[in-house]
Structure formats: C-alpha cells, structure tokens
C-alpha cells in the first residue's frame, strides 16, 4: 500500500469511525468507478445544483465559486462521494447539513455518514474551479465536460444516470457576454463586473452542462415563432452575413423534423448555439446551448459541396441529440454509442430533403463505410457496445465504430423492422424514458415486440462483437453463362461468427449492372438466382452501398474493376466498387501504382462531385503513403497536369475547391509549386474560385513545408494578413513546426510535454501533421517514440478524440518499416496496467502504417 493510499484510508477511517476493513470499502478509487456510481444511482435522487462562479478578467487568476447540492438520500449509512478531481487546496470549505467534516481522497470529496440524513440533504461547497475542462483563453472561456470532465472543474456527481436540475449564476467582466443551459433571468452590473442569473434547467447529466463567457458577438433570429441566438467571435462581418441565414434555417428545419418524427416537443426552452474557434469537436449537444467548431458553421466562399453537406449534417446531428442523449440519456457510457448512432441516423434522414441534387445513398456509403472499415479491419477493432469499469476511460470509447459503423447497423435494423415499426418503437422508447436514463437492452425490448426476428442474437453479433466478416465471391462460368455463384463468409478472428445481413449484388453486364438480393444466414450463401445469366463483367456483392464487410472479389471482377471501373454508369455502384478496391489495395491485391493510375483515368470522367472528392482523397493517400520518392517523381508531372486541367474544367466553385485542395496537397514539381507561390502572392488568380483567408493560410503552410525560397518571410507575411485574433494565434502556434531548422521543430515538439501547451488541441494536431509531413518523415521519425510514450498522459489530460487524433497525426506521414517497428516494440513492451483501449487505438492508428511498410518494403 502506497503512502498516499495509507493516508486516504486513515482519512476515511477517521470520518466514519469504522475499522480498517470498512474504511477500505468506503475509499473511492480515482475517476468515477462503476461501483461508486452504481451505489449513488441506487440511493440518491432529486438532485439540484445551485452554482455561482466568479470569472476574473485575468487569465492567471482562478475562478472561485460556491455550489449547493441538494438531493434525497435513501440510505445514509455510508459516506457520500462527490467527484472533484483537482487538488485538496481547491476545496475551501464543505458544509453538509450544517457539519463541516470531509476528506479529499483520490479526486473525491468524501463526506462522512454522520453528516448525512435519510431524506433531504444539502451540501454547500466553496471552491476554486479546476482549469482542465474550462478551456480558458485571454478573453473567453467555455466548458466542455463530456464524458466525465465536469469533476475537473466543479464538485459534482459526475455520472450520466444522476441527472440534476441546475441553477447557475455567473459574475464576469461587464464587457463580456455569457450563457448557460437555462434562459437568462436577471442581469445586474456594479462597476466593471456583471452578475447574470440563469433559470433552472430540466434534469441534465453533468456532461451536458455548459457555461460560456467572454468577448462574443450575438446574432438573433426567429423561425416558426421560436427565437434562436448564435454567439460567435468572427471578425469578418461579410462571412457572418453570408452564412447566418442558412445556419438559422438549418437549425429550424432540424427542430421541425425531429418534433414531427418523435411527436415530442423540444424540451429545453431556449435554443442557443455558439461558434467556438478551434473547438475540439464538430459540435457538442449541450441542452439549450450547442457548441460548434466555428469553421464548420461559418464557411468560406470556396466551400465544397462536402463542407456544405457537413455543416447541415453536424447541425442536424447536434439537434437530434436534444432527444437522443439529452431527453433520454444512456445509463452508463458503455451505451454512449446509442446517442451518437441516433443523432447520425436522424441527421441523414433530415438533411436529405435540403440537398435534392445530392445522391444521398452514395453519401451514406461514403460517409460511413470507409471510416468504419478503417477501424474494423485492424487488430485493435472494438465493438459498438463496450465494457466500461471507470468513466476515466470513457473518452477512449469514441471513434468511427460508434459514429460510422453504428449507423450502418441501425439502418440494417430499421430494414428488419420496417420504417413505421422502427419509428413507432423509437417514439415509445423516448416517451417511456423522457428526462431519465435507458440502456440498449431497454430499446431492444421495445423493438423486439415489433418483429419476429431474434434481435438479441442479431445484437450479439453486430453490436457486442468487434470486426467485420470476410466475404469471398465464388463464381463459376460454363459456356458463357453463370453456372454457380456463392459467397463464403469467414470470421477473420476465428470466433465462427456469422453476420446476418442482406447482400445486394451487382452482376455487371454490357447493358449495365443487374441487381440481385440474397440473405446471408450461414457460412455459405448461394445466389442461385444468378444461374444462367450471361457471364458477368464483374460481380460486386457490396453494391447499393448496403452490405458490410471485407469483400474479396473473384479474379475476373478484380481485374475488370481495376481496368474499367469508370465504365460503370451508376454512381452508387461505382462508389461501392471504389471502397472495395481500396480494401484490395490495403490487402496487397492491387498494386498502389495501378490503383493510382486508375484514379487518374477515372477523375476526368467522373460526373458526381461526391465521387470526385472521394477519388481525389484516395489518390492523395496513395500518393504519399504507398509510393516511394522515385515513383512520385516519375508520376508527378502527369498527376499535377491532370489536377490543373480538372481545376480549370470544374464547373462550380465547390468543385474547383476540391481539385485545388488536392493540387495544393500533392504538388512537388517546380512548375506547380512556383504557380502556387504566385497564387499565394495574389499575382495569379484561380479562375472561378474565390480564395479566402483560410485558403491563403493553407497555401503558406504547404509551401513552407516544401521549403520554397523565402518560406520564412512568406509565413511572416501571411501572419500579418490574418486579422482575426484567434486564427492569428493558431498560425503563430503552428509556425515553428514548419521551420526548415530541425532544432526549432524539435523545440516546438518538446514544448508539448507541458500540458498547458496542449490545451488548444486542434492547433497541436495541425502542427503535428506538418511536423510528420511525408516530405519530412525521415527527420520526424525520431519523435515517434516520444509521442507514443506521451499517449497515456494525453488520454488523461485531453478531450475525447485527442488520443486517437494525436496518434493519427504522428503516424499518418510515415510508411517506413523503421517506424512500424518502433510502434510494434512500443506495444510489445507496454506495462500490464496499460489501458487496453489505448493499446487498441494504437493498433488502429498504426494499421495503415503497417500495411504501407509491408507493401513498399521491396521498393
């Protein structure tokens, strides 16, 4: 037993008056352990928080506050555990029902049973707020408490199934704006300080509580009798004016759709949203006050179709959370995927009518399958529903499996039940559990009554197990006709699982593909309906963007698609084929050079903007990850010429932006790099493409990493062009990572050891991406080990997506065996207590590196 643990046990013993055994039982472990949370949820109810915070103007000064927590307690026989993971010095006083005894143990305030009563209790705490989840800046702050980070700032019951009603009072500099989940009730000003009192909220879990204060501008609008407010820090008035109506319209449409779909009115009163510069996520669904990444809302004139669709999707996603997550909340974060899958699922339904020109089946395919496969093909794949013993690991549960695989699975479930049964089941589920908590099993119970399908067994494979099936096409042709066609399913992990699903199979014919459908129910699925058809050009079992798996094509189909994919007229079939061929490249079945050549042949003929963007992405990834320098040098003139021609011929600014972005990303020849320098210097226009500040900033960074002549002066000039203080600060932060001087880059990376220098996570990630740019991979490989060593600390101190993104930024520019071996050695030598989820996300991030190193090893 460590000295710290001994002291903690002694403290609790003194408080309870019990013996050592009882004290050991009472002492809470760090984080939010499941056993502590389970006891609290069973004994505590009716929680109310009355929080007052004083926010100083000086960044170095602490926030001071008081909170009174009222609750009913059914069993006062054990000490009460509150979560407040800062330090003992932050706790100024604790008063529980008029008694002041407490201990500070492992990030918890522990109140002795002697201070508690059966029934109503009140605990008043004076404290200095912890900074870790306050996101403080010189002239603004915002809280971000998901998944269990409220305890890093405030004393709370930090678990999703102890919802509380919140009354908040904020005192701050008079020039600042502020907002909380509740509506503003009262505002008073004395000198340079203003105090704002906000209305009590509906019951909320702590991760949905949000406070903002600072130098924000406020836009207001009314739609369908409802008032909306948008807080932002954008200094470009024209950009705000260009975007504001669309932003308000998208929120209003989302609310209207969801109220009609669920038959439940919006439950949280006011509707504010805040555009945060360099926000860590796309958005966060705080009830009554959604936070967004400003760059995803306030688009430039050169925004692509994907960016406009992305804005509509993130607004719809976060609005859907008002029902799925906010109104009904998962009981424990092992079911966090439920709120995310329904938010994505609803977003897809409601965005579609706003973009009638878009092929939405293709969008669903491209938005979900590739990202989900990036995880599910790896040795570190995780199931949709995971086991979670402590909320201090909840952040590592997020990722492509819950955001992208789960919507695919949910669409399969909707098809099993039928749209009406599925919708009615969701309505019953939301009504039954409104303002409360529920589990996946609660939902399955509701849906099970609406179908003869065994949903429990279906869920065991699709939801509870990681990975995807390998599905091999088995085709025989006799006399120019299909003799047999079957599909053999295999579990690559050796568990003998069978993933029940529907295969929608394209049988390629000269007149176009014929679609047949079969149901997978066992290891071998016979497509006897195809017997007698003319010999196919190809067989694509993943057509129609429906089936999920690693589809291994027969040799003839693989050869045809690799040579003639552009001949396929149907965009959804083409999209499915591209996703399948990318899998084939990664498995060594298609040479990277042949794949790149296919992209170059396809791009001039591609008519769908979504497909163009996807093919450009595949081409760029193949270019940097799977070709060596000599191969790039040989192909660069043709590649860049094609991109410049595509840029010239693209018909809309959105299309041109996609071509220009790829050209900027891959340019290496003196001619193209020189032209980009002229564009950055504003001496050469890009006809038909209005370039914004963000475009010139990205150009400056890309040119600097190529060490063009005068790169340092170029960065200084670009810094001077940037007027917005937030964007200027980001550029200044990233600049040293672009330096041609290795020592300066080394100092920049070394500074990231200090958690204070990692607070602006998007800034850090941008710098890391340039530090490890493929053009500098040889010099950057020395930083890989240190980045891996920091991962556990990154997980403890960062927000939910940061560990995976840290790894992706570190490893994404590398393809060498040396770096792959560094990662393997790191994983081999991990201590026994290393978090399994961090090990898994390391395997996920390293998977493409491993494959690239293997594919390129003999080049």
What would you call each of these model-derived segments?
Residues 6-17:
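Bacterial N-terminal signal peptides
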Residues 1-3:
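N-terminal secretory signal peptides that target proteins for export/translocation
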Residues 15-20, 350:
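Hydrophobic membrane-targeting alpha-helices
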Residues 369, 482, 486, 495-497, ...:
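Long, ordered, helix-rich scaffold segments
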